[in-house]
Amino acid sequence: MSKDATLSSLNQIFIRALKRMGDAGDADAACRLAAQAWSLLRQDWPKEAQRLNGAMHSLTKPDHA
């Protein structure tokens, strides 16, 4: 597996964990973690950063707030 594919898989796992945090009532902490990860990925892996951006938007929907 390439490094990019590995990163993509890890990011998908991370996003699932963030969504579970949100479902468990800790959407604020999940958003903070997602924002930190987005900051790390945005320059070199913009596609993965965009996936995290989508997760942050999902976490801020009224059902998570």
Question: Which functions belong to the PLM regions below?
Answer:
Residues M1-A65:
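C-terminal-biased regions
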